[in-house]
Amino acid sequence: MGEHNLFNPGFVGQLVNINARDAFYLSNFRASGGQLAGLQTLRLSRRDNVCSLPWNPSEACSGYPQSHISGPVTLNHTYNQSCDITRQEDNKCFYSDSACATSGGGDNNSTNLISKEGALDNSSVSITAENGQNNLNGMDNGGSYSKYDCLTPAEQPIPNPRLCRSLESVSGCSFINEGAKTSSGITHSLTSPDIQTSVAALNGGALWYPMHRQTRKKRKPYSKLQLNELEGEFILNEFITRQRRRELSDRLNLTDQQVKIWFQNRRMKKKRLLMREQALSYF
């Protein structure tokens, strides 16, 4: 870097607050002895003319480098104004778990800001891609957009585990159970045998499982021997007694109910024949 001489180009760049009419053109200076002898006659009356404000190295302005000024540079008051503008812009607050990180808080805060700005840049690219896809989907669905299409991932609603647990505990309520009962009743009614038999009849097929229905017993016809015995007993006595009915049932291998029904039917048949004969006699 060299000696900290007043006329060294690297050292002159650190002087900040100089009047606008005072300008140093560093390209005119050379390392010859005559020029140095001439420059030594220049004297500064007071330090206030050189720098009116004390310089704080911790509040360095990142917009302008302080070392290695190669060309002719004019230092004036606009330099401090630009520093104030950049300080106002950098004085932002990023909320974190521990504290509020600002730009003037030191090296740790500046590194946190740089990392967060990089993360925001990367997330902005992904967010724009996702929003573009969501917009395309919304236009395909007729231009309807959902509630959370334009939100960033940090602004998306997070499900509350306590609310989820409360909903799970409320799942045993009466109205939910009633809804489950009604749905189960509907499915049970749809799977009833009557509906399935009708569906099978419409489809022209048969069910693979037997029907659980009380079917009527198949009519068992009487044999000729049984009919002859019953006809002979009917000719002798139309109204048979209980004792005689038991004897016939035991002898003909029939039940008491069958013998009783046969005599009832036979009496009705005889009555119809008599009514027919009477009707034919009138004509």
UniProtKB/Swiss-Prot annotation:
InterPro entries: HD, HD_metazoa, Homeobox_CS, Homeodomain-like_sf. GO terms for cellular component: nucleus. It is found in: Nucleus. GO terms for molecular function: DNA-binding transcription factor activity, RNA polymerase II-specific; sequence-specific double-stranded DNA binding. Pfam families: Homeodomain. Residues 215-274 bind DNA. Sequence-specific transcription factor which is part of a developmental regulatory system that provides cells with specific positional identities on the anterior-posterior axis. Belongs to the Abd-B homeobox family. This is Homeobox protein Hox-C12b. It comes from Danio rerio (Zebrafish).
